[in-house]
Amino acid sequence: MRLLLTAAVLAASLAAASAAEIEAPGPQGPLRGLLAGPAGADAPVVLMIPGSGTSDRDGNQFPGIRAATLRLLAEGLAARGIASARVDKRGLNHSSEAVSDPEDVTLAAYADDAHAWIKVLRERTGAPCVWILGHSEGGLVALKTASTRPEGICGLVLAATPGRPLGALLREQFRANLPESPLRQPTLDALEAILSKLEAGQPADLSNVNPQLAGIFRPSVQPYVIDLLAHDPAKMIAATDLPVLILQGTTDLQVTMADAEALAAARPDARLVRLDGVNHMFKSAPAERTANLEAYANPDLPLADGVLEAIAGMVLDDPGTTSRRSPAQ
């Protein structure tokens, strides 16, 4: 019994030693994250950027998204000799002190945060460069980060990342997911009016809009949406020559293979991996909506086959990991 207890304590101490809370400077206070996996300059390091809204470092978002996609990625990569940093976005969760208003943000501001993390991670680990993995909207942050200052970045992993301007994607999502009802066409008409205003860089009037749309496009987030709408992911990926892995599931209800193919067309040398039967959370799921969304709430459902293999293969095989040895910025 004592031997088992000693082994348990040792295992716990080793686990604790492999994960550490870390900080990077934010605009008003610290950005916070968790560095996990093997230590030392020989281990590649992946910075994970979560998706839209209030997504946390694990990739979860209250109330319905508990798939823990980023945590599962970190654990799987650690088992393959790859370290990772999972971070909370400015103003949210453990990074709540970084800014007073998390909705007052731009892609460029998120890119500034990513650069701050890259500097911290290179100094702490001794790694010559850091990979950036962006999930969903986080992939746009990864592209913005690479386009503003590529130094110190090994390459990009774009996981379920939009490949078309956000306006086109939102229109497609609403058309695909709104059920047939008397409210369907009025909602689509209202969406078109809102997006047309925001795409023109102007605030949208929500006075006669249904509560669902009014919540999504509330005045406090409209400046950020205007900023997002002005970016074309295909042009962004074409502007960088860093190694890129594009990961896309075929049963993703939010981002589709058309997005992945648009990114790949803009960068023909990028590595595109199609994951059959895999949804937006990188879990195996059917295309049927109800069953697909059930995987969003299940942290015990493992990542789909091929996800970790694709990422680890890119990170461990690509020469960018060892060749991009520019000085820390």
Where do the model's predicted regions map?
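Accessory cap/linker subdomain of secreted extracellular hydrolases
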Residues: 157-227, 231-234
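Short beta-strand/loop motif that positions the catalytic acidic residue
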Residues: 240, 246-248
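Short, surface-exposed "cap/lid" segments of acyl-processing enzymes
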Residues: 41, 46-77
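Conserved alpha/beta-hydrolase
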Residues: 68-96
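Catalytic active-site module of serine/aspartate enzymes centered on a nucleophile-bearing elbow/loop
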Residues: 281, 287-329
